[in-house]
Amino acid sequence: MKERNTELVQGFRHSVPYINAHRGKTFVIMLGGEAIKYGNFYSIINDIGLLHSLGIRLVVVYGACPQINTSLKEKNIKIIYHKSIRITDLASLEQVKQAAGKLQLDITARLSMSLTNTPLQGANISVVSGNFIISQPLGVDDGVDYCHSGRVRRIDKNAINCQLNNGAIVLIGPVAVSVTGESFNLTSEEIATQVSIELKAEKMIGFCGNQGVINDEGKIISELLSNDIKNIIKKLEKKGDYISSTVRFLKGSIKACKSGVNRSHLISYHKSGALLQELFSRDGIGTQMVMESAEKIRGASINDIGGILELIRPLEHKGILVRRSREQLEIEVDKFTIIEHDNLTIACAALYPFFKEKIGEMACLAVHPDYRNSSRGDALLKKIKMNAKDMHLKRIFVLTTQSIHWFQERGFILVDIEVLPESKKKMYNYQRGSKILMIDVI
């Protein structure tokens, strides 16, 4: 029990920066019909209620594809798609309305639950739906009439913001009205994308059957830049219509990112708590799509000294790194390069040039324990080499007692102390006995 309580306290403390960062921001959450149909759906709804209680402005856009298909099959109505978009004739439209209407009531009812001993106890959430979306027909494509399948014409963002300002969750379904008084069936991905853009949302969040976007090795891709998503989409499209909703979300995320939405996230509807893990932990659990990476390699400034000290102090205590005082770091901070992930310094290294000998020392290489099995050390080494080349240095050397093999695997060779610059030779600590390794700057 004690360990469990400790984990709870630590987890809560680690989430506080994200709670503060998200408060007052607008998130658009897209719940596809597959996510609603799955058994974990009520857990997702509870987590949405939790986000609301933390002061996050929420728009929930839901789809109903599998529910509509079930209704159509029961009525013996033919299911027709063209380019992954449903052909919605009048008979199909009636089933679309019924399925979407039922889900609206079900979601509203679940978010309204406030019984004792339930996750939403005392939440008292207001859920508002309305004619926030004005639609228009898709028309005819390649001779195929989409009938009552439509697209977004405009969004009443003022009405949505009014409800959000009043503390309500705005719930938007796949059926939207038109200026002619007709109803049209829209994809939830398009609605979520357009709403995110119009509201200038901080995040657009979608759910899928996988943990996120999976690479060819079956591993989760934690971050995608918008330019890389296109290649992923091409691969996914070859796999067929069963993943077309994921493809549409990824296409929407490109548009959203380019239009000012800070980040889009794709997470699993299978895993309980995935929404919270994605939003309130440093590395998340799914895939996030961004215009610029959340992880940056840059030169350090005086404001980074605290983060650098947190990285190197444990290694100094173990004798792996030579101890540096805060005062020394303040003087030498311009020699440091850091890797920053979501405003946390996760790796650092320094380059001390000896211009007369055209040689540089790479020192103080440190990586956060959570990232040591990644390639951050390699990324720093590459950046240090680039910096050395810009300084017209020809070689880089390191002094190390623990990481000899790591450097050798990357092309460094053991050398004698005589190759060091004279000033460095005079400072060499024979008692410490560090190995000297060197590499040419290419």
Curated annotation (Swiss-Prot):
Main location: cytoplasm
Keywords: Acyltransferase, Amino-acid biosynthesis, Arginine biosynthesis, Cytoplasm, Transferase
Residue stretches making up the N-acetyltransferase domain: 295-442
Reactions this protein catalyses: L-glutamate + acetyl-CoA = N-acetyl-L-glutamate + CoA + H(+)
EC number, UniProt record: 2.3.1.1
GO-annotated biological processes: L-arginine biosynthetic process
Entry's localization field: Cytoplasm
NCBIfam families: N-Ac-Glu-synth, PRK05279.1
Assembly behavior: Homohexamer.
Full protein name: Amino-acid acetyltransferase
Organism: Buchnera aphidicola subsp. Acyrthosiphon pisum (strain APS)
